[in-house]
Amino acid sequence: FSASIGKAKSKKTFNVSAIVAAALKNSTVLRYAAELPEEKRKVLYIDTEQSPYHCLKVMKRILRMAGLPDDRDSGYLEFLALRKYTPEQRISIVEQAIYHSPDIGLVIIDGIRDMVYDINSPGESTRIISKLMQWTDDRQIHIHTILHQNKGDENARGHIGTELNNKAETVLLVEKDKGNSDISHVSAMHIRAMDFEPFAFRINDRALP
């Protein structure tokens, strides 16, 4: 599994939208190239903190970025809005969806901190990270999670952030440009495979890169 981290308003969700769009197209969006096998083309996107209205906006933007019509179901993208549930209920719903949705290749968890009550609890953090590793192994899928950075430093927030850094294959850092807040920079904070060149993006009037 992998993760994106960044401060509030750094456009982490937008960056992940590009990853999902690349997976839906099975080609390249921004600098992300995806190649999912034919029997694992489905993407499951889980949002734990936004309203259904905001989730719909994110879904439409992903479809537009993938060059797909945004007014009908693509068949390859499944969205779960879990804001109203408790952390245990969220884990249970996500587990059910991962094990009972056929053809899934990529799972996004936008808001992994909402799968625990206390981000500084070693027990809870170890449990959810172990779940991520179990799900990826059992279902042979890739999971990408999103987590905020601490306000005061570059670290991912809480004990769950420490666990993510220790266990993730890749941790992407999304940062606002210091001189122009319309621009965000993406770099690999930690990567076990081949490194990639940092890049930047800005969003146009149609909310596209």
Where in the sequence are the language-model features?
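Short histidine/acidic/glycine/proline-rich micro-motifs that form metal-
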Residues: 10, 50, 84-85, 150-152
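Walker A/P-loop NTP-binding active-site region of P-loop NTPases
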Residues: 1-68, 171
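Short, flexible, glycine/charge-rich loop motifs used to bind or transfer phosphoryl groups or to couple energy/partner
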Residues: 30-36, 67, 95-98, 134, ...
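Phosphate-binding/switch region of NTP-binding enzymes
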Residues: 3-4, 9, 123-208
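Conserved RecA-like P-loop NTPase ATPase core
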Residues: 20, 45, 110, 168, ...
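Conserved inter-motif catalytic segment of the P-loop NTP-binding fold
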Residues: 37-123, 127
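Secondary-structure boundary/capping motif
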Residues: 12, 54-55, 117, 153-156
